[in-house]
């Protein structure tokens, strides 16, 4: 190949104008949201994001060169909500799709991966692979025995019986209420998965449930049962795609016989989307006032103050998130806002602050649609509940309308390691949050405050959801729900992913599909993001960077694991759900 040919191939990736087959390799992982810093952006520049998939497939629908989509499932685990998102996008793609993989788990469960494959028109499985569509398992760890061994005594109060973080640290076994909600979570996940598989594979639900209990199932048995369409290796998958979708070409350089072969041009979805976006980037630079749906993300623990990045991730600082929502309110080009929530909650005060900004957006005449990701619980639900509509994935963990508070008593630990801590208090309750046990007065204060926060949470939730408080109360009590169950009970409005939320936002803005641009907020050059904002009302205040000495010190403290608890509106426990 000449130097000129090599340069041409770089500039024009498909010089022969072959049919394009998009490749989505889930084994390489999928990012759910855009990087929050320039450094993260550099490290993740080759990764595929949900936005790449959504925008790339949307562009491919209108591109006559694109003839199909090949999805490599692989074994990389995706969170259940992300798996819902990917499956929804694949199912909505109207051109032919093939899903292939080496195995759906190797003698282990991989139910979420198989559900994604079922969104494709056709499924291929390696001969030695298995279908591990075996259901869902949830587990939680109780630390009471371990804490006792080191002399730590947990003291937590909760509202109410389902807000079960207290037993995570103080229980020797899970409560009946916790066992009930955990069992319902996995049952709901399996019910939805069975329904999806039965519909996609044209099977009876009872038949699918029976196959779940037989998993893992070998390739030939899976083929016979109708769970897959073909048994074959990767090369056989790509040979089949070339024969179906390729253009016949006479080969010479690598095949001296000069026989005719079918050829395609594979392209990763993220690379295809980047090229498609580049072609319109210049025009968009001069059309920033184009009517748009603004997407604002609330990712991570909700904390007071800014979203200061750290090695362990970037929390959802309520000051930063509030500024982003204000920026959208003041931007005349933003016709509607999608608030993307992936948070287990945190600060009650911060959550209420964000909810206020959501309500002000609505008062300004701009519809707000909440889109729930993997988790939108407790404080994560609080910031979403004031939206015009709430959209949740069927596997989203949401609800947890409740409150908890407490501390760890460290006197026993100090005694065991020979540590002496002395102090002085100026004020009757100045030492309430020190390492000692609560006094009776302090415990009364804590419980009164938890009652007040719980009442505020449930009252506002009932108001936002338009239901009487006595109807909402049984759905609250700290209980978590899947998105599917929450929709049946009126806690969310629609079951679907971000693509569904964007469609609902366009409808509420009175726009036709595709009429509004999709803009991730804040949309600013990296250099501007590094500059300090002029005030809390300026666009730059929506970034959340703090590169001063205090900000760097807080980041260093977070690196050393010295971060404060997220807050009283936190998800009570984080179940480890394995599929």
Descriptions of predicted regions:
Residues 125, 228-234, 391-392, 492-498:
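Short acidic-hydrophobic, aromatic-tinged amphipathic segments that line or gate anion-handling sites
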Residues 67-68, 122, 230, 335-336, ...:
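Residues at the N-termini of beta-strands
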Residues 296, 339, 384:
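Conserved hydrophobic/aromatic pocket- or pore-lining residues that grip, position, or stack substrates
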Residues 486:
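Cys/His-coordinated zinc-finger cores
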Residues 1-63, 72-74, 137-219, 224-333, ...:
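Intrinsically disordered, low-complexity segments enriched in small/flexible residues
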Residues 60-67, 94-95:
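Short, solvent-exposed loop/edge-beta patches enriched in aromatic
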Residues 72-211, 216, 343-481, 502, ...:
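Conserved catalytic cores of soluble enzyme domains
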């Amino acid at each position: 190949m000449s130097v000129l040919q090599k340069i041409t191939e770089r500039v024009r990736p498909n010089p022969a104008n072959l049919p394009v087959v998009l490749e989505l390799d889930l084994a390489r992982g999928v990012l759910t949201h855009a990087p929050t810093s320039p450094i993260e952006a550099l490290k993740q520049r080759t990764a595929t994001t949900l936005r790449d998939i959504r925008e790339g497939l949307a562009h491919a629908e209108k591109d006559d060169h694109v003839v199909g989509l090949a999805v490599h499932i692989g074994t990389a685990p995706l969170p259940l909500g992300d798996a819902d998102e990917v499956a929804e996008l694949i199912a909505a793609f109207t051109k032919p799709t093939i899903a292939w993989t080496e195995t759906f788990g190797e003698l282990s469960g991989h139910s979420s991966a198989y559900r994604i494959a079922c969104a494709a028109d056709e499924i291929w499985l390696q001969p030695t692979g298995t279908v591990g569509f075996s259901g869902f398992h949830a587990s939680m760890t109780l630390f009471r025995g371990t804490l006792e061994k080191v002399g730590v005594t947990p003291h937590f109060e909760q509202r109410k019986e389902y807000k079960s973080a207290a037993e995570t640290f103080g229980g020797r076994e899970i409560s009946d209420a916790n066992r009930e909600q955990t069992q319902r979570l996995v049952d709901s996940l399996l019910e939805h998965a069975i329904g999806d598989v039965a519909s996609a594979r044209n099977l009876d639900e009872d038949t699918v449930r029976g196959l779940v209990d037989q998993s893992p199932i070998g390739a030939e048995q899976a083929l016979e049962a109708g769970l897959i369409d073909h048994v074959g290796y990767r090369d056989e998958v790509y040979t089949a795609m070339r024969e179906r979708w390729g253009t016949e070409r006479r080969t010479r350089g690598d095949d001296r016989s000069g026989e005719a072969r079918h050829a395609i041009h594979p392209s990763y979805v993220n690379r295809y989307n980047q090229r498609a976006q580049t072609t319109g980037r210049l025009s968009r630079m001069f059309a920033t006032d184009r009517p748009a749906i603004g997407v604002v993300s609330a990712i991570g623990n909700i904390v007071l103050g800014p979203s200061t990045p750290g090695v362990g991730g970037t929390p959802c600082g309520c000051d930063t998130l509030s500024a982003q929502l204000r920026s959208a309110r003041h931007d005349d080009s933003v016709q509607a806002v999608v608030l993307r929530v992936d948070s287990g909650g945190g600060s009650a005060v911060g959550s209420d602050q964000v909810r206020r900004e959501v309500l002000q957006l609505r008062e300004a005449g701009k519809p707000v649609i909440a889109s729930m990701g993997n988790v939108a619980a407790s404080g994560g639900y609080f910031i979403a509940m004031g939206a015009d509509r709430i959209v949740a994935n069927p596997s989203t963990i949401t609800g947890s309308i409740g409150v908890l508070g407490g501390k760890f008593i460290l006197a026993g630990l100090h005694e065991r390691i020979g540590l002496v801590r002395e102090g002085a208090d100026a004020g009757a309750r100045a030492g309430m949050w020190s390492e000692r046990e609560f006094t009776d007065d302090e415990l009364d204060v804590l419980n009164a405050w938890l009652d007040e926060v719980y009442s505020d949470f449930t009252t506002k939730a009932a108001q936002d959801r338009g239901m009487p408080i006595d109807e909402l109360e049984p759905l609250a009590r700290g209980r978590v729900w899947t998105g599917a169950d929450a929709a049946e009970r009126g806690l969310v409005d629609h079951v679907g992913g971000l693509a569904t939320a964007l469609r609902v936002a366009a409808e509420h803005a009175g726009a036709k599909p595709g009429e509004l641009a999709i803009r991730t907020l804040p949309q600013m050059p990296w250099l501007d993001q590094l500059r300090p904002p002029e005030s809390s009302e300026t666009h730059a205040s929506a970034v959340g960077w703090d590169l001063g000495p205090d900000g760097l010190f807080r980041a260093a403290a977070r690196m050393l694991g010295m971060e404060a608890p997220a807050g009283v509106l936190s998800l009570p426990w984080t179940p480890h759900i394995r599929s």
